[in-house]
Design a protein with these regions (language model features):
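Acidic, low-complexity intrinsically disordered segments
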Residues: 1-210, 387
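Catalytic cores of alpha/beta
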Residues: 110-115, 258, 319-334
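Radical SAM [4Fe-4S] cluster-binding motif and immediate context
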Residues: 154-312, 327-330
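Conserved beta-strand->loop/alpha-helix structural units within folded catalytic cores of enzymes
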Residues: 307-312, 317, 331-340
């Protein structure tokens, strides 16, 4: 069979569109900056027998060439990309392709997705993808493919590279998160709340297979089991690669051994969900792992070990008033967050947050294209939708003034070339719309 994987592009009104892989800085130093987008497709490609051909494309409807004929088209769908994905799927089906949709949105709303697909994947797909290929060969495909058990972490294969001139790649050493925050679409997917670890030997084998010098751990959090993470980092130290990773601020800040091992292994940046500067907001969201009182202390400790921080902040929790924007800006400046990223709280289908707001009659629209973390799609409790949106835009505008960008970049020079370069990219690609 001739197979095509499609990654639909979406646009966020808070962020100016920017093609990182075509930027000057990534042309100059492609081996220093880890960029990649899809984790699912390289894994599914590796699970596809060699007798099938596999192509990959990313873009919106206008950027895809529908003149090429494919037997099977797989599209990964987020809530924000749902309509664009459905449009792409419908066009491929008109051309006679068998289309499958998977991802977080189809997993939450499989019946909706089925209207635009021949088959829908619910949840993890490592076990069900091979089954689909067999079913197509026997001409007995199912309408829905859903795993009956969680994927064994060690059954995840070494990825197959689908992108030419890829400057970096992503992988997972662990899968799942037991915390189940109210707003999180990941931990509320079937089996994704179960924390699983790949054998360290498997992870090292995969890293050796990829010749690039930069990569990113896209684990839900690589600090859930810090003992495992320490052993993993020790094992990859001699590979001489640099990487970024998701982690929890409270775990990182109080474990100097982990920080030292991470730095020595090549970690240049931690991506951290601070989420809010309001204790009440964190508690209401179920974010039990964050302690605001130690933010500054822990950020300073991470910096002492030469690693930068990309900080994620969410606005719109029920206890948020208009004061939260100024307080967050003060915290970012005071703690010296290297690349702060603002998001508007978004109740994605399938999450407890969506179910609660829906039951309270506070969902304002079900236009999924607006569910991109940059629009207000629900009625906030302590401010108007307009106040939430406008203040989020203004906060982003303040955070990314040229003077603030330059100050953060200069401050990062002490961390070395790789870290300061990555900070530069993050500070100049996240520009507010003019």
């Amino acid at each position: 069979m001739k197979i095509l994987f499609v990654w639909p592009k979406i646009h966020n009104p808070i962020y100016k569109e920017f093609d990182m892989e075509k930027s000057l800085i990534c042309r100059v130093a492609p081996k220093l900056v880890p960029f990649s987008k899809s984790l699912t497709f390289p894994i599914l490609a590796a699970l596809t027998p060699d007798k099938h051909s596999v192509d990959y494309v990313e873009g919106d409807f206008s950027q895809i060439d529908f003149s090429n004929k494919y037997d099977l088209v797989g599209i990964t769908v987020t809530t924000a990309s749902a309509y664009e994905s459905y449009k792409i799927a419908d066009e491929f089906r008109k051309n006679g392709s068998f289309v499958v949709l998977g991802g977080y949105h189809p997993s939450a709303l499989p019946q909706e997705a089925k209207q635009h697909a021949d088959a829908v994947f619910i949840g993890e797909s490592e076990d069900t993808w091979p089954q689909l290929l067999e079913d197509l060969e026997t001409k007995k495909p199912r309408e829905y493919y859903e795993p009956t058990h969680p994927v064994n972490a060690d059954s995840i294969p070494i990825q197959r590279n689908l992108q030419k001139n890829q400057s970096g790649f992503v992988l997972q050493a662990t899968r799942g998160c037991p915390n189940k925050c109210e707003f999180c679409s990941i931990s509320n997917m079937k089996f994704r709340y179960l924390f699983r670890k790949r054998s360290i030997e498997k992870v090292v084998e995969e890293l050796r297979a990829h010749k690039g010098k930069s990569f990113a751990f896209y684990d839900d959090s690589l600090t859930i089991d810090s003992n495992y993470t320490k052993e993993l980092f020790k094992a990859i130290k001699d590979l001489n690669k640099n990487f970024i990773s998701y982690g929890n601020i409270n775990v990182l800040g109080k474990d100097e051994e982990l920080l030292k091992i991470a730095r020595d292994a090549g970690c240049i940046t931690w991506m951290i969900g601070f989420e809010s500067v309001s204790p009440k907001s964190l508690k209401s969201a179920g974010k039990k792992t964050n302690n605001i009182e130690v933010y500054e202390k822990h950020v300073k400790k991470i910096h002492e070990y030469g690693m930068s921080i990309i900080g994620f902040f969410v606005f719109g929790f029920d206890y948020d008033t208009v004061d939260v924007f100024g307080k967050t800006t003060e915290m970012i400046d005071h703690c010296e967050i290297d690349a702060p990223l603002p998001f508007i709280l978004t109740p994605l289908p399938g999450t407890p947050l969506y179910n609660r707001l829906n039951s309270e009659g506070r969902i304002l629209t079900r236009d999924w294209s607006k569910y991109n973390l940059g629009n207000v799609v629900f009625q906030p409790k302590m401010m108007t939708p307009e106040e939430l949106f406008n203040n989020a835009i203004e906060a982003h505008r303040e955070w990314y003034k040229i003077s603030n960008n330059v100050r953060r970049i200069l401050r990062n020079l002490k961390f070395g070339v790789r870290t300061s370069l990555y900070t530069t990219v993050n500070n100049f690609f996240t520009k507010y719309p003019r």
